Amino acid sequence: MKSGLTIVEMAQQIERQSKLKQDYLLDTRRLQVEPFGSQLYLHTFDDHDDPLVEPLEINQIAHRQIGTHLKIPAAYYDRMLSDYPELLAENVNSWFQREPTQRMVRTLDGTVRAFL
Protein backbone atom coordinates (compact mmCIF):
# COMPACT_ATOMS: atom_id res chain seq x y z
CA MET A 1 0.00 0.00 0.00
CA LYS A 2 1.33 3.41 -0.94
CA SER A 3 1.41 5.86 1.91
CA GLY A 4 0.81 9.55 1.42
CA LEU A 5 0.06 12.52 3.58
CA THR A 6 -2.09 12.19 6.64
CA ILE A 7 -5.19 14.36 6.84
CA VAL A 8 -3.38 16.69 9.26
CA GLU A 9 -0.33 16.95 6.98
CA MET A 10 -2.56 17.63 3.99
CA ALA A 11 -4.40 20.37 5.88
CA GLN A 12 -1.08 21.92 6.90
CA GLN A 13 0.14 21.80 3.29
CA ILE A 14 -3.05 23.45 2.03
CA GLU A 15 -2.79 26.17 4.67
CA ARG A 16 0.89 26.79 3.84
CA GLN A 17 0.11 27.06 0.13
CA SER A 18 -2.81 29.41 0.70
CA LYS A 19 -0.48 31.80 2.53
CA LEU A 20 2.19 31.66 -0.19
CA LYS A 21 0.07 31.93 -3.34
CA GLN A 22 -0.43 35.22 -5.18
CA ASP A 23 -2.26 36.04 -8.38
CA TYR A 24 -1.48 39.09 -10.50
CA LEU A 25 -3.49 40.49 -13.41
CA LEU A 26 -0.87 42.19 -15.56
CA ASP A 27 -0.41 43.74 -18.96
CA THR A 28 2.26 41.75 -20.80
CA ARG A 29 4.13 45.01 -21.39
CA ARG A 30 4.77 44.93 -17.62
CA LEU A 31 6.45 41.51 -17.86
CA GLN A 32 10.01 40.68 -18.78
CA VAL A 33 11.71 37.30 -18.99
CA GLU A 34 15.41 37.12 -18.17
CA PRO A 35 17.77 34.15 -18.44
CA PHE A 36 19.99 33.34 -15.48
CA GLY A 37 22.05 30.19 -15.79
CA SER A 38 19.83 27.45 -17.15
CA GLN A 39 16.64 29.07 -15.78
CA LEU A 40 14.36 31.83 -17.00
CA TYR A 41 12.96 34.28 -14.49
CA LEU A 42 9.89 36.47 -14.88
CA HIS A 43 10.13 40.07 -13.75
CA THR A 44 6.92 41.96 -13.03
CA PHE A 45 6.63 45.74 -13.02
CA ASP A 46 3.99 48.25 -11.96
CA ASP A 47 2.85 51.27 -14.01
CA HIS A 48 5.88 53.25 -12.79
CA ASP A 49 8.31 50.51 -13.90
CA ASP A 50 9.04 49.55 -10.29
CA PRO A 51 9.35 45.81 -9.58
CA LEU A 52 6.21 44.29 -8.05
CA VAL A 53 7.95 41.25 -6.58
CA GLU A 54 11.32 39.54 -6.69
CA PRO A 55 12.08 37.77 -9.99
CA LEU A 56 10.02 34.59 -10.24
CA GLU A 57 11.09 31.16 -11.44
CA ILE A 58 8.80 29.71 -14.11
CA ASN A 59 7.60 26.11 -13.78
CA GLN A 60 7.08 23.76 -16.74
CA ILE A 61 3.32 24.25 -16.86
CA ALA A 62 3.68 28.03 -17.00
CA HIS A 63 6.37 27.70 -19.70
CA ARG A 64 3.94 25.67 -21.80
CA GLN A 65 1.18 28.23 -21.25
CA ILE A 66 3.47 31.13 -22.21
CA GLY A 67 4.51 29.32 -25.37
CA THR A 68 0.91 28.51 -26.26
CA HIS A 69 -0.20 32.11 -25.66
CA LEU A 70 2.59 33.43 -27.89
CA LYS A 71 2.00 30.72 -30.55
CA ILE A 72 5.56 29.38 -30.20
CA PRO A 73 5.56 25.66 -31.06
CA ALA A 74 6.31 23.55 -27.98
CA ALA A 75 9.28 21.70 -29.49
CA TYR A 76 10.92 24.99 -30.52
CA TYR A 77 10.14 26.63 -27.17
CA ASP A 78 11.68 23.67 -25.33
CA ARG A 79 14.74 23.68 -27.59
CA MET A 80 15.35 27.39 -26.97
CA LEU A 81 14.80 26.88 -23.23
CA SER A 82 17.41 24.14 -23.02
CA ASP A 83 19.90 25.25 -25.70
CA TYR A 84 19.58 29.01 -26.07
CA PRO A 85 17.61 30.64 -23.21
CA GLU A 86 18.77 34.11 -24.28
CA LEU A 87 16.97 33.65 -27.62
CA LEU A 88 13.84 32.43 -25.86
CA ALA A 89 13.89 35.47 -23.56
CA GLU A 90 14.30 37.78 -26.57
CA ASN A 91 11.39 36.12 -28.38
CA VAL A 92 9.06 36.12 -25.37
CA ASN A 93 9.86 39.72 -24.42
CA SER A 94 9.40 40.91 -28.00
CA TRP A 95 5.99 39.23 -28.32
CA PHE A 96 4.91 40.48 -24.90
CA GLN A 97 5.59 44.04 -26.12
CA ARG A 98 4.34 43.65 -29.68
CA GLU A 99 1.00 42.02 -28.80
CA PRO A 100 0.05 43.27 -25.33
CA THR A 101 -2.76 41.59 -23.42
CA GLN A 102 -3.93 41.28 -19.85
CA ARG A 103 -2.82 37.96 -18.36
CA MET A 104 -3.17 36.36 -14.97
CA VAL A 105 0.14 35.26 -13.49
CA ARG A 106 -0.41 32.73 -10.69
CA THR A 107 2.46 32.25 -8.28
CA LEU A 108 3.28 29.99 -5.40
CA ASP A 109 6.31 30.42 -3.19
CA GLY A 110 8.30 32.51 -5.69
CA THR A 111 7.46 30.42 -8.75
CA VAL A 112 5.12 31.16 -11.64
CA ARG A 113 2.80 28.17 -11.66
CA ALA A 114 0.33 29.36 -14.30
CA PHE A 115 0.12 31.95 -17.07
CA LEU A 116 -3.55 32.40 -17.94
Q: What residue spans do the PLM features occupy?
A:
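Feature for intrinsically disordered/low-complexity regulatory segments and propeptides
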Residues: M1-F115
